Regions:
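Short, structured motif recognition centered on aromatic/hydrophobic residues
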Residues: 6-10, 65-72, 83
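Helix-rich interaction surfaces within compact, conserved domain-sized segments
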Residues: 6, 17-20, 75, 80-120
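Short, intrinsically disordered low-complexity segments
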Residues: 40-71
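Short, low-complexity, polar/charged sequence segments that are solvent-exposed and flexible
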Residues: 26-30, 51-55, 89-92, 117-120
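N-terminal, charge-rich interaction modules
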Residues: 1-52
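Glycine-rich loops and low-complexity Gly/Arg-rich segments
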Residues: 31-35, 56-61, 94-98
């Protein structure tokens, strides 16, 4: 997967909670990348910086969601457990939609992952 652990974030407000999340990830040497709406059609593997993935240059109309979502890329099980525990320990509202980047979903775009997570 990714060489350096990375968390993709969607629809986070520029507030104190987001600042605390960024600070925690930085302390743990995990990168944080906010994904913007125009990038929602890009393959998750591309957004995570995986080799072999290219930017989707085709035109897409529509497609958006407004809920927060996290995609953890290249985190060890221990890193992901500690990250999720951080929300509880700090009393932060949890993120309902979260996933690990996998060999299957790395080919999906953010909208497809969102739809799959909403179904679960």
């Amino acid at each position: 997967m990714t060489e350096k652990p990375l968390v993709l974030g969607y629809n986070f407000k520029p507030d104190e909670r987001t600042r605390l999340i960024r600070r925690y990830l930085n302390k743990e040497k995990i990168s944080f990348r906010m994904v913007e709406v125009p990038e929602f059609w890009q393959p998750l593997g591309y957004l995570a910086g995986l080799s072999g993935f290219q930017k989707d240059t085709s035109f897409h109309l529509g497609g958006n969601f407004f809920e927060e979502m996290l995609v953890m890329c290249g985190l060890s099980p221990d890193q992901s457990d500690r990250f999720l525990r951080f929300f509880r320990e700090e009393g932060l509202d949890p993120v309902a939609l979260k996933a690990m980047l996998t060999p299957v979903n790395q080919h999906w775009n953010s909208l497809k992952l969102y739809e799959e997570l909403k179904r679960e």
